[in-house]
Amino acid sequence: MTVKNKWKMSKNPLFRGDRKDAVCVPSPEADDSIVRHIMYFEGPGRKTPYLSTSEEYELADNFSNGAVWQTFVKMAKAESVEHISRTELLALMKGNGKGKAKWPSAFEVMQARRYVEQWGEHLLDFRKVEDPAITTQIIFSKS
């Protein structure tokens, strides 16, 4: 599966497959490596300052554990959540990666890049958020 339509930050929602009762709460103080997050190192329940989202409902539904949630970039930014777009992620993931996507293995960076392309992935960055539990409740609604 690949993303087909041009996603527009100003009008299109971002979707997240998650639990039925609530969106997982990120940990702003956790390791902020983007490759570590996307590659899902350390498995379920790992601490991460990011929440993965997708441009398409159907793609997010693949990761659903009961519900697909949605938000808008404007809502997230209003609550001090930073948005890292798919385009930005792809630009960071070349060679051994750049910035927060820098990683010792160029192969793992390349694999993370493939996942971003495949799932139309965007990241919501909670590193500057004081109370991520409340913030996730404010910015996400069931779609």
What are these regions (language model features)?
Residues 1-143:
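NAD-dependent ADP-ribosyltransferases
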